[in-house]
Curated annotation (Swiss-Prot):
The lineage of its organism: Bacteria, Pseudomonadati, Chlorobiota, Chlorobiia, Chlorobiales. InterPro entries: Ribosomal_uL3, Ribosomal_uL3_bac/org-type, Ribosomal_uL3_CS, Transl_B-barrel_sf. Keywords: Ribonucleoprotein, Ribosomal protein, RNA-binding, rRNA-binding. Belongs to the universal ribosomal protein uL3 family. One of the primary rRNA binding proteins, it binds directly near the 3'-end of the 23S rRNA, where it nucleates assembly of the 50S subunit. Pfam families: Ribosomal_L3. Residues 128-168 are annotated as: Disordered. This is Large ribosomal subunit protein uL3. SUPFAM superfamilies: Translation proteins. NCBIfam families: L3_bact. It comes from Chlorobium luteolum (strain DSM 273 / BCRC 81028 / 2530) (Pelodictyon luteolum).
Amino acid sequence: MGAILGKKIGMTRLYNDKREAVPCTIIQAGPCFVTQVKNAEKDGYDAVQIGIGERKEHKVTKPMLGHYKKAGVTPGYMMAEFDASMFDVELAAGSPVSVESFKEGEIVNVLGVSKGKGFAGVVKRHNFGGGSRTHGQSDRLRAPGSVGGSSDPSRTFKGTRMGGRMGSDNVTVRNLQVVKIMAESNLIMVKGSVPGPKNSYVKIVSIKK
C-alpha cells in the first residue's frame, strides 16, 4: 500500500520477458515530503498531506511558506492529501515519501487533470455526426442542430450537449501496472498512459484490497 505525487515526464517502451513491447509512462515521483499529518481528534479525520519538489521561497505565498516551514521542509510545487490508511508505516511532518513503497507488478490508480483543448464544437466534444454534406446546405456541416422547440418545451433543457470548453477535467485512470521502479532516481514507470501533458503533476495510489 502506498500513495505519492509525481511529475509526468513522458512515454517510452520497455520489453518484457516475452520480448513484447510495453508502452510505459515515466513519472518522476519525488522528492516528496510529508507537510502535515491530520488526525480525527484535531481535524475530524485521519489524513497525510504530501508535497513534491523544491520551489524558490519568493514564488510561494507567505501563508503557504509558513505552512512549509512549520513542517520543516522546503516549499514545493504541489500538495495533496491521502487517507492515512494508504500508508503501511506511521509518518510525521517532514518525513520523506519514496517510490519504494510500491512494488513492480503492483496495480495502481493514477489521478490527474486531462489536457485542455480550449473551446470545442459538438462534433469534437460530443462526437456528433454533423449535418448532411449535400443537397444544397452550406453552413450546417458541424452545427449542433435543434436544442429545443419553440412552443413546446419553449426552453433548452439543462445538460443539453453543446459546444464549450473541452478538457482540463479531473481524470482517474484505473488498474495500471507498475512495470519498473528506479528508486535511486525517484522514477516509476506504469503501463499505459496517464492524464495530462508532460510536466503535469499526478497522484499515484495503490488499490485498496
